[in-house]
Structure formats: structure tokens, C-alpha cells
């Protein structure tokens, strides 16, 4: 019987799953759109929805709960300062999952998970080292 088996294990230990979803939630809040496998996106959605609800409730205790869940203080600040006011009138359903074909190599089903009414400019922002074009000194 599969009674009580609510979440997917994703072939990872409990610690690995928790860390992975904390990192994925921080990435989704930072970029407001990420590409991942479909099962991971489906498991990430309720985590992020609950984080946005924490942001909407506000308060120091909710901020500390979000920090313990996500472990990225900069993204918690964005959650409470940017995302919470954006979704203050929306009762849930802050994210959407769009199927994005299959990954080359292992044929894994891929998906895009993104915030509804997302900021298009946030995608790819501060996503790692960026080479700046060297200006020629004449």
C-alpha cells in the first residue's frame, strides 16, 4: 500500500533533497524562472508557494522561518520586499509549470517553473561571473 507516501524521493537522501529544494527555491526567487525536470518542478511548487505565503504574512517570525527553509538571506529579503507586495491580492497560485520537452542525453521530461506576473528582467541576473568587454585604450 502506498498510504502516507506524499512526496517523491527523487533517488536522493533526505538531507540532499532538503538542500536541493532550498537551493532551487532560492534560484527561483532570484531569477523568477528556472528550467528543471518535471518531477522536481512539481515538488518545488508547494515549497515556493508556502514561502510566498510566509512573505505575505510578514513579521520577524515568518522571516526566520523562511531563512531556515531557504538559507539565502538575500533572497528572503527579495521575497518579503518584492514578491509579497506583488502577490498581496492573489490567494495562492503564485507559480506555473510549463512542460518544456525532453532533455537530450537521458530523455528526462523537462519543465519551466516560473512566477505568475514575473519580472522579465530578473532572469539571468547575477547568475555568475560575467566577462566584461575590455575597452581599448587609445
Swiss-Prot record:
Keywords, comma-separated and alphabetical: Ribonucleoprotein, Ribosomal protein
Q: Which GO terms describe its molecular function?
A: structural constituent of ribosome
Q: Which PROSITE patterns match?
A: RIBOSOMAL_L17
What biological-process GO terms show up in the record?
A: translation
Q: GO cellular component terms?
A: cytosolic large ribosomal subunit
Keyword Cytoplasm present in the record's keywords: the answer is no
Q: Quaternary structure per UniProt?
A: Part of the 50S ribosomal subunit. Contacts protein L32.
Family, as annotated = Belongs to the bacterial ribosomal protein bL17 family.
Question: Which NCBIfam families does the UniProt entry name for this protein?
Answer: L17
- HAMAP family assigned: Ribosomal_bL17 (MF_01368)
PANTHER family, per database record: LARGE RIBOSOMAL SUBUNIT PROTEIN BL17M, RIBOSOMAL PROTEIN L17
UniProt name for this protein: Large ribosomal subunit protein bL17
Amino acid at each position: 500500500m502506498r498510504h502516507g507516501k506524499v512526496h517523491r524521493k527523487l533517488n536522493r537522501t533526505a538531507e540532499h533533497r532538503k538542500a536541493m529544494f532550498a537551493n532551487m527555491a532560492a534560484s527561483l526567487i532570484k531569477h523568477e524562472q528556472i528550467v528543471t525536470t518535471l518531477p522536481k518542478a512539481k515538488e518545488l511548487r508547494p515549497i515556493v508557494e508556502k514561502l510566498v505565503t510566509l512573505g505575505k504574512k510578514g513579521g520577524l517570525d515568518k522571516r526566520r522561518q523562511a531563512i531556515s527553509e531557504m538559507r539565502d538571506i538575500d533572497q528572503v529579503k527579495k521575497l518579503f520586499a518584492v514578491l509579497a507586495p506583488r502577490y498581496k491580492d492573489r490567494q495562492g497560485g503564485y507559480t506555473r509549470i510549463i512542460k518544456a520537452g525532453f532533455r537530450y542525453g537521458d530523455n528526462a521530461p523537462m519543465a519551466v517553473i516560473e512566477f505568475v506576473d514575473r519580472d522579465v528582467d530578473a532572469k539571468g541576473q547575477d547568475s555568475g561571473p560575467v566577462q566584461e568587454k575590455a575597452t581599448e585604450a587609445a
